[in-house]
């Protein structure tokens, strides 16, 4: 599966325990997203188009209106990446 660099970065953050907080408009469409790392930092690469691509590829999911998290398909699609912390 072809995954762009911003999508890969977002999936990597989600795989390490991050989450995507979203805002919906009155019709129920997602209008704003922010990706938070498990430490609470905001990931700048996580934009609405990146979120839409990940959602359409079914690599992330949300249950009962909670923040979006990575699912098993997303974990399989993410490539290993060194962590420079």
From Swiss-Prot:
This is UPF0386 protein HCH_03746. It comes from the Bacteria. InterPro entries: YjhX_toxin. It comes from Hahella chejuensis (strain KCTC 2396). Belongs to the UPF0386 family. NCBIfam families: PRK13687.1. Coiled coil: none annotated.
């Amino acid at each position: 599966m072809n995954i762009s660099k911003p999508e890969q970065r977002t999936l990597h953050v989600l795989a390490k325990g991050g989450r995507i907080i979203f805002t919906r408009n009155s019709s129920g469409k997602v209008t704003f997203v922010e990706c938070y790392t498990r430490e609470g930092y905001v990931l700048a690469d996580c934009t609405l188009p990146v979120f839409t691509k990940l959602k359409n590829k079914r690599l992330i999911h949300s249950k009962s209106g909670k923040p979006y998290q990575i699912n098993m398909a997303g974990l399989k699609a993410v490539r290993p990446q060194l962590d420079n912390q």
